[in-house]
Structure formats: structure tokens, C-alpha cells
Amino acid sequence: MLRSSITQSRQLLLSPARSRTASQWLPRAGASNRISGQRFFADVKPPVVPGAPTPASPSSDTPIPPETVPKSTLADEATLPPPPPPPPAPVRKTGRFRRFLIYLILTSGFAYGGGIFLAMKSDNFHDFFTEYVPYGEDCVLYFEERDFYRRFPNTLRNANRAPKDEGNKVTIPSKSGLSWKVAEEESGADLSAKGPHMSAVEQKGDEAQIKPGTAKPEEKVAAVEKAKSDKPVKEEAPKDTTKVQEEPRKPAVPAVTPIEFATVNEGDEAVVQELVKTFNDIITVIGADESAHKFSGTIIKAKDELQKIGEKIIAIRDEARNAAQEEIKEAHATFDESARELIRRFEEARASDAAQYREEFELEREKLAHAYQEKIRTELLRAQEVAEQRLQNELVEQAIELNRKYLHEVKDLVEREREGRLSKLNELTTNVTELEKLTTDWKEVIDTNLKTQQLQVAVDAVRSVLERSTVPRPFVRELVAVKELAAEDPVVEAAIASINPTAYQRGIPSTAQIIERFRRVADEVRKASLLPEDAGIASHAASLVLSKVMFKKDAVAGSDDVESILIRTESLLEEGNIDAAAREMNTLKGWAKILSKDWLGDVRRVLEVKQALEVIETEARLQCLRVE
């Protein structure tokens, strides 16, 4: 309300000035526009007429040359009619829908961008974003592909490469190559002897390979179809022992005797085992080749050398172990001799130290005995002196006591003589003293009552400022007066310290303002009451629309929904129970509690101020009761 009134007053004050300024500057603006529309050239010299005035020199006071001043324009200005008034300004469109659409697009873009960035950094958020956000999975997949292509730029280059030209296809007949049956090796077969396996000449026949250069396309197709139609021969289990087994087919290439792996009997060393493993890997590679028989002699020699190397390593290890055992024995003997020598030296040092300590102990004992004797002698002398001094003091005290008794007796005699005349004077002095004491006590009572009344008046002033103000007003001066009047009261100081500085510096709202603001907050809370905790933009829009058509219901005592809490709070505010209303609003949860947080802060400051004033008034009454 205050802001709207200030804005209206500013508009009213500024509108006449603006109209006057616009009307004054319109003709001048038209003239300047006309002048600015013309072109002038400073480098063109006007014709010099005889008798014309000479131009001003640089030393004269004229800052602008007269040649550059357009005379005809000023003459025409008086003859021109006044410009028409400007047309009224068109009504400016608010463009709320356009702004809403732009904000929605920007917000969605920022939200999707941040979501995609977090999804690429966190696996948990990646699952949530791709599962619950529309088009989230496509966006994340697109950026992941871009990141992959950025890291591996050669991927697309290899994928787009043209396939290689393999030339003519090579077809392998169906029955060429090795067979699944193992060929029976004849006794006494020698791989080094000449035979069909040693010949490099190709056999002629139907099973020979078709050369890729001479084969026709029809033959290639027929060979491929034939290879596909052939199936592996399945071995049938013999049902009857009397049937003759099928004779196995001989393989095209004879079987090669595998080379045995190298083994070292005493190869428990890691180096030997690693060497044997490497050698066996070499044997495996050679055995997989068809020309393994060529390296059989070399492999056998290498195995013998490997066996010798293993034996040498074992021998070297045994020699090193024996040498180490001898060195260990010698070291043990040396250590034993050193230990015995060390023990002997230790015993000698301990004996010498014991003798030295014994001598030092005797010297110290004699010193201590002498010191104690001197101390006892000194204590005896001091005790004797103290006893003599105590005796002298007792004698002096007795003399003083005798003098005191003598003076008391003399005083008693004098008092008896003055009893008759001074008795009434003593009574009068006593009465005057009691009267002075009573006057002092009553003065303190009056001062206390006056201070209590002033404190009550200051508290009433603070309360009147809070109750009569229609807008929040600061009450710093009134609160300072209360603090000065109760400077030595810890209760009042604690109550003032409990008030938030913002409350007395800016003021607190009245009850009517609290109720009015509650109604505005209640509308916003009703709009957000249908929102879940993880609501999106669509949920906000749906909640805003549904809040317009919601019906208000009656408050239920045990209900904890938002509408019931708002109705109970409103009824409590109308009854004047602000504390209970704040407690009701504090039970809200989620968006409703976030929206009502500022209202609860204002109510809390109001309650703090009221509670502090009640405490100060109670303390003032308690002081009055204490005085009575």
C-alpha cells in the first residue's frame, strides 16, 4: 500500500513537468531536425563581394566563422508554419505471454543443459535424468556420441573407408585338407625319408585346388554350392561287435610327431622355471607349424643345454648356500665372542659405578647429617627466642588489661555521677537517630516507586507506538528509554536483548497487517499445496490452474492437510491468538512451509516484542510488590 501510494504521487508530480517540457522543446526540435537534414561543406569558399565584411581573425572573440552560419535557414524558419502536435503514444502492449514463453524456453534450455552436464558427470543422476526427463536420454546420447567422436576422430574416417578389392575368390573343394580321423602311423616310419609329404608338386585330379586366375565364374559358384551342401561325417557307434568297422580315410597331409616339452628335474628355482616355460612356448609355436621336423635336432640340443644350465644354476645355488652357511657360522662365533667381551666390560663398569656411587652416597649422607644438625640447632635457638618474646608479650598484655580495668572503673564512677543529667540527652539522641534512619528508608522507597512508574510509562509508550501505528515504525528511542530506566535490572536487559535488532530498527507489523499478509500468503500456499517435492514446470502450471477451482472446506481438528491448517490459522488470527496461529502455520511442510517462511518470521518478531514487553511489565509489578 505504501509503495503504490508513493508511486502514484510521483506520477502526479512529474506529469505536468513532462508535458510542459515536451511542449517547450517541440518547435526547437523541429528546427534542429530541419538543420540537420541539410548538408554543409566547410571547404567550399563563398564568393567574395566587394564591400562585404571581412572574416574575423583568429585573435577575435568570434568562435564561429560567419561563412559557416546558414542565413537562409533562419530566415525561412519564421515563415514556416508550426509543426503539428505529435500523435498520441500507442498503447503499449504488455507482452506477458511472449515474456512467459521466452522465460520458459530459457529456463528449459538452462535446465536441460545443466541436467545433461550433471548426467555426464554422475551415474546416479544419469539414470534419473534419462528415465524421468522427457527426451533426456536422446540428448545425453547425442552429447556422449559427440564426446566419443572428439576423443577418437579416426573412428569416422575408418568407418567411411571403401572396402578393399580382394580380387577373384578362391574356392576350396569339400574333401581337401585334413580329415577328422587320425591316420595310423606305420611302425618304423621316418619323417626325414622321402615321400609324398616331402614333395612340393601338386597332385592332379578332381580334388586339386582351382586356381583363381583360370577358374570360371560358373565353376566358382558350383564349387561354393558343393562345399555348402557337404556335411561332416558322423561317427556311428558300432551296434554289433561282429560288423567290420569302416576303414579310416588317410589324411591328405601325414601327421607330424609332436616335439616333447623340456623339463628340468631340479628346477625349483624361479629363473629356471621361467626359462623352461619360455622354451616350451617356443616348442609349442614350432609344433603348430608343419615344418616342425626341421627343428627337432636343434630343439633336442637346446633341451640338453637347458638341462645343463639348470644343473649349473642348482650347483651355483648350492655353493652359494654353503658359503652363506659358513659365513653365518663365522658371524655367530664373532657375535658370541663380542657378546662375552661386552658382558665382561659391562660387569667391570657396573662394579666401578657401584663403588663410585657408594662413595658419593657416604659423602652426601655426611652432608645431610651436618645440615640437619645445623637446622636443629637453629630451630632450638628460634624456639627459645619465641618463648621469651611470648612471655614478654603476656606481661605487656596483663599491664594493658590492668590499665583498662582501671579506666573502666573510673568511667563507671563518672557515669554514675552524670546519670541524672545525661540520661534524657541520650534518649533524645537515640530518637533523632531513629528518625533519620526512617527518613532515609522512606526516601529509598519513594525513589524505587518513582523509577518503577517511569519504567511502566516507558513500556506503555512502546506499546502505544506498536498499537497505534498503521505501518511498521521503528521504536528505538522508546526502547532506549526503557533500557536507561532499568539499567541495573538483569531481567529487563535480558528481555531487551532477546528482541531482534531488525524489529526495533524497522518496526513490526500490526495485527491487521499480519492478517492481510496472511491472506495473500494463504493464496500462494493454496496454489503450491498440490505440488509434490520433485515437481516440474508442468506440475507448477497444473497446481496453479487447480488452485483456482478448489473449494474451501471447514476446518477439521485432527486434519493436517494444507487447507484445514490455513482455515484454522485464519480463525485463530481473527480471534487475536497470534501465537497459536503461528504454531499452526509451522506444521506445514514442503513448498507450503517455504512460501510461508517470511510471514512466520514477521509473526515471530511480533511475538518476541510482545513477550519482552510482558516480561518488563511483570518485572515492574514485582519490584512494586518487593518495596511494599
Curated annotation (Swiss-Prot):
Residues 42-99 are mitochondrial matrix. GO terms for cellular component: MICOS complex. Residues 121-628 are mitochondrial intermembrane. Residues 1-30, 44-92, 183-252 are annotated as: Disordered. One of its GO terms (biological process) is cristae formation. It is found in: Mitochondrion inner membrane. Pfam families: Mitofilin. Residues 1-24 have a biased composition (Polar residues). Residues 301-444 form a coiled coil. It comes from the Eukaryota. Component of the mitochondrial contact site and cristae organizing system (MICOS) complex. Component of the MICOS complex, a large protein complex of the mitochondrial inner membrane that plays crucial roles in the maintenance of crista junctions, inner membrane architecture, and formation of contact sites to the outer membrane. Plays a role in keeping cristae membranes connected to the inner boundary membrane. Also promotes protein import via the mitochondrial intermembrane space assembly (MIA) pathway. This is MICOS complex subunit mic60. The gene is mic60.
